[in-house]
Structures are given as structure tokens and as C-alpha cells.
């Protein structure tokens, strides 16, 4: 197990509860002689902290562990920036569901102590890269831990596009768009659109149509190493967008090409030893819960 001495802290902005956990983390870690580095935006949330301040990029270079305080969205943002550094990430849940941020604030110090003593499990999750081309030239790029989504933006018109997988034509479709999700993202937007839940260890990607104008279109699960290409129809009257984890958007135009592939490196997630994917699904999604009688 890794020995953690230099620990970075990243928090979601604008939350009183996050501030409470940040203060608790800072007090606990400094009292136990850990070198704590706080992310530069996060540092503004706790004035007078007296800690070293660094950008997310620098955290990836100088830390042994980064703790993210917030919801799954906060961890998604940190993961995209820290993936290349291969630094382990631990999540403290101050959001809603908490599929990725699985340490509860109520027992933060107890659970954190065990992790820092080496009592934890580690798993890797892959990300997606998305490249948008226009007239054969690069237009934009993004990465995603959950999903890359083609959507109509503010328009209510359908999008016409062609789908290719590994160079093979799959179909032409008119719909509200397409969700391309990792196993991590299969419990997020993809799930809401009728996609399957995939175990995080699967090397696979799911393609989920959004309100397709057909009765036969269904989600497709493909090899994680596949290259997915979307070609936006030339006759589209709408200008769709491509989003990455719902946090970054690239505006597209008719004729643009979107290429989606697996990122060459993965993120490292740290969990308490009692972490279990099925238990998480049961708890967060309400599996096997009974309807209470009125």
C-alpha cells in the first residue's frame, strides 16, 4: 500500500457543509503531522488556513493522495485534471447520491484514519476522450469519466446523425442525441435514459439513444477499445453540442465529426475496505426497497 504523507484537498465551491468538512479535514491532518496542500480555489473557502496552496495540476505533481470534498460532480472535475498524474483520489460525500464519493462526513475521521494506515482498496476507472472536427480540422477536445453526450443544446429540434463503430456504419438516426457512457457513467445520465448498469471493472462503453424517432433503437454495449464516430447530418437545422460529464460543452455544426475513444490512462480511486459496488447500488438506487403502506 502507498504511504501517504503529502495530501491535497479539493472542495466544491459555495457549500457551507463542504466548508465544515474542509475545516475538519485540515484540523485532523495537520494534527497528525501530514503535509496538507489545498487547491487554490478551495483555499478561498477557509480564510486563514495557513496551508500551502497549489493548482490542481500542481497537486497531481506533489501529492501522494488527493481528497475531494463534495458530490460526484466535484470528483468528476478533479479526476479529469488529475488522471494523467495517476495520483489516487478519495471522495468525501457532501453531495446527493455519492456513487464515487463514498466516505460519509459523520464518520470522516475514523474512516480516513484507516485509509491513511493503509487499510483501503483501490480500483481504476477509465475515461473517454472526445475530439470534434470541422472541415478536416480540429475544433475542440474534452475528456470525461462519466459520459460524452451529443445533445441539442437549447433547441428542441431533433438531431440527425450517422453512427460508426471502428469504421463500420451502424445507423443513421434522428433523436435528441446520444449518450456515450463508461461503466462509471452507467449509473448516471445513461441510467436515466434507459441504459444498463455496468460493473466498473468492465472494459466496455454503452451507447444510449435519447428519444429516438424509431421503435427499434436500443442501447448498444461495445468494446471499450472501440472508436466511436458521430457525423452530424449536413441538413440539420439545429446546431447541437457535445458535453463532457455535463461540465464542458463544444458547440457543433452540420457536417462536424465527433470521435470518441478510451483515454490511454486511468484514474485511481481509493475506497474503505467495506466498499462494495452492489451494496452501493442497493443503497443509492433503492434496490429491494418496499413501498410503504399509507
Curated annotation (Swiss-Prot):
**At the top level of its lineage, which domain of life is listed?**
Bacteria
Q: Which GO terms describe its biological process?
A: NAD metabolic process; NADP biosynthetic process
EC primary class: transferase
Write out the annotated subcellular location. Answer: Cytoplasm
Active site per the UniProt annotation: 72 (proton acceptor)
The molecular function GO annotations come to: ATP binding; metal ion binding; NAD binding; NAD+ kinase activity
Catalyzes what? NAD(+) + ATP = ADP + NADP(+) + H(+)
Q: What is its EC number?
A: 2.7.1.23
Recorded hits in InterPro entries, A to Z, give: ATP-NAD_kinase_N, ATP-NAD_kinase_PpnK-typ_C, NAD/diacylglycerol_kinase_sf, NADK
> Which positions are annotated as binding NAD(+)?
72-73, 146-147, 157, 174, 176, 187-192, 247
The positions making up the signal sequence are none
- Annotated keywords: ATP-binding, Cytoplasm, Kinase, NAD, NADP, Nucleotide-binding, Transferase
| Native species | Marinobacter nauticus (strain ATCC 700491 / DSM 11845 / VT8) (Marinobacter aquaeolei)
* Matches recorded under Gene3D superfamilies: Probable inorganic polyphosphate/atp-NAD kinase, domain 1, Probable inorganic polyphosphate/atp-NAD kinase, domain 2
Please tell me whether the keyword tRNA-binding is annotated for this protein: no
A single cellular component GO annotation: cytoplasm
Regarding protein family, the annotation reads: Belongs to the NAD kinase family.
Q: Does the keyword ATP-binding apply?
A: yes
**Main subcellular location of this protein, as a coarse class:** cytoplasm
The free-text function statement in the UniProt record for this protein reads: Involved in the regulation of the intracellular balance of NAD and NADP, and is a key enzyme in the biosynthesis of NADP. Catalyzes specifically the phosphorylation on 2'-hydroxyl of the adenosine moiety of NAD to yield NADP.
S-S bonds: none
Name of the molecule in the record = NAD kinase
Q: Which Pfam families match?
A: NAD_kinase, NAD_kinase_C
Amino acid at each position: 500500500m502507498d504511504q501517504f504523507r503529502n495530501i491535497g484537498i479539493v472542495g466544491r465551491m459555495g457549500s457551507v457543509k463542504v466548508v465544515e468538512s474542509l475545516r475538519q479535514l485540515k484540523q485532523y491532518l495537520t494534527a497528525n503531522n501530514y503535509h496538507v496542500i489545498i487547491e487554490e480555489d478551495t483555499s478561498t473557502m477557509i480564510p486563514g488556513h495557513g496551508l500551502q496552496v497549489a493548482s490542481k495540476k500542481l497537486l497531481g505533481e506533489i501529492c501522494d493522495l488527493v481528497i475531494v470534498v463534495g458530490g460526484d460532480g466535484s470528483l468528476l472535475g478533479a479526476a479529469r485534471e488529475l488522471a494523467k498524474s495517476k495520483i489516487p483520489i478519495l471522495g468525501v460525500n457532501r453531495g446527493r447520491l455519492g456513487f464515487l464519493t463514498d466516505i460519509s462526513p459523520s464518520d470522516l475521521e475514523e474512516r480516513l484514519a484507516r485509509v491513511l494506515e493503509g487499510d483501503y482498496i483501490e480500483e481504476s476507472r477509465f475515461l473517454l476522450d472526445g475530439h470534434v472536427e470541422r472541415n478536416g480540422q480540429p475544433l475542440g477536445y474534452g475528456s470525461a469519466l462519466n459520459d460524452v453526450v451529443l445533445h441539442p443544446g437549447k433547441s428542441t429540434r431533433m438531431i440527425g446523425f450517422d453512427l460508426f463503430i471502428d469504421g463500420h456504419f451502424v445507423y443513421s438516426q434522428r433523436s435528441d442525441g446520444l449518450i456515450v457512457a463508461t461503466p462509471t457513467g452507467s449509473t448516471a445520465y445513461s441510467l436515466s435514459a434507459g441504459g444498463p448498469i455496468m460493473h466498473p471493472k468492465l472494459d466496455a462503453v454503452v451507447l444510449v439513444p435519447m428519444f429516438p424517432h424509431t421503435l427499434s433503437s436500443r442501447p448498444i454495449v461495445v468494446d471499450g477499445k472501440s472508436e466511436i464516430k458521430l457525423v452530424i447530418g449536413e441538413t440539420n437545422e439545429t446546431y447541437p453540442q457535445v458535453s463532457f460529464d455535463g461540465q464542458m460543452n463544444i458547440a457543433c455544426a452540420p457536417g462536424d465529426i465527433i470521435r470518441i475513444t478510451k483515454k490511454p490512462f486511468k484514474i485511481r480511486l481509493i475506497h474503505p475496505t467495506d466498499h462494495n459496488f452492489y451494496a452501493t447500488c442497493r443503497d443509492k438506487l433503492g434496490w429491494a426497497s418496499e413501498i410503504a403502506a399509507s
